Structure formats: structure tokens, C-alpha cells
Amino acid sequence: MRITINIIILFFISLVLLNSSLFAKEIILDDLQNGLSPKWKEKSFKGFTLYSVIKKDDRWCIKAESDASASGLYYEIDYDPVEYPIITWSWKIDHIIPKGDAKTKQGDDYAARVYVVFHSFLFWKTRAINYIWANKLPRGEFIPNSYTSNAIMIAVQSGPENAGRWILERRNVVEDYKAAFGADPPKIEAIAIMTDTDNTGEKAEAWYGPIRILSLP
């Protein structure tokens, strides 16, 4: 009888371990339900984009309003993307930026973008991936930023087709980094969002849902 009980216990333990391995581990940067976490910091490049936490379409989100301005919110975090390779978020824009053009400095403005910043001991060699809602760039295209080749722009959305609706994005940061830089990624040190219109002088509005970081199941 004791042997039978031990076998049953071992069976349930193995079942629990198996089930836990089938589910991804998750980190939520900020669920936004208590306002903006103090872990978010703002960096201004020209003026200030207005960021506020609101409830829109029955979901908590960060609203961004830019008027010829460029500032971003960044969230410092230290993790290995090999352990947590997936990043997901939802976003929505009111409209694209008509003069936006990812291939020129004059058009380097985006209704919405999400940055992933990678660790470097030399700050001038810091690399970043920018997931952008582009205007003209074909969806899925990778190009260097018009100001620095250390930042790669990836057009996960492009054009006005999906403007006005929530879009859920899911990216494998490890795969994107390898495709962008031809190497394995170092640790990630920050994730940021930015809506900017300083180069074009236009206006833009966007909404960002909570950002989640996931392991693979």
C-alpha cells in the first residue's frame, strides 16, 4: 500500500512539473491599473510628448499626445532575452504621420514605437531595436535609423490601414536582434515607448497597452 501511495505521489509531482513546463513565464512591466509606475522615466529630445494613463475601449493604457515634440518613456529592466525572448504589447494610433519617412532624418517621426535597448559597456555602442508604426516603409522591413546604425527600425505596422483599431504585436527579440545585427543579443537594459513629431512638426496621438515579456513554453 505504501509503495502504491508513493507511486501516486510521484505521478502527481511529475504531472505538475510537466504542466508547469508547458506554460510560458511572464513579466508584466506595468499593468497601469494604479497609474503610471514610478519606474517609468522620461527622456526629452525636443519638447515633451504628453503621456497619461487612461482607460480607453475598456482597457488601461498609456495615451501619448505629440505636437512637434519628441520625448519618450523608458523602463529600466535587466534580463536575458534568451530566457525571455518574446515581447508583446497592444497599441493603437489615431492616424499616421503624413510626412513621416523612416529613410530620412526629416521624416524620422512615428505615431508609435516601442524600443528595446541592449546593454553595452560603451554607451556609444549601445544598440536598440525600434518596433515602429511606419508611414511608407513596407511592413516587415528592417532598416538602420537615419541618425545611427546602432538602432534598427522594424516596421511591424505601416500605413493607415489599421489606424483607429487596437493591434496586438508579438515579437521574438532574439530572432530580431540576430537578423538586425548578425549576432547573439546581450542583456536588455531598458524598454521604451515614444510618439514623436519633432522632425515633421505634425501632431499625433497613440495608445499603448501593457508590455509583457515571455519565456517560450
Regions of interest found by a model, annotated:
Residues 32, 191, 211-213:
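Extracellular beta-strand elements of beta-rich domains used
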Residues 50-72:
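Short carbohydrate-recognition loop motifs
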Residues 24-45:
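Extracellular carbohydrate-recognition regions
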Residues 90-96, 119, 174:
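Solvent-exposed strand-to-loop "edge" motifs in beta-rich extracellular domains
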Residues 76-87, 160-163, 184:
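Extracellular/lumenal carbohydrate-interaction signature centered on repeated Trp-anchored short motifs
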Residues 107-151:
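Extracellular/luminal beta-rich ligand-recognition
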Residues 7-19:
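Bacterial N-terminal signal peptides
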Residues 109-114, 149-159, 163-205:
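Extracellular beta-strand ligand-recognition surfaces/modules
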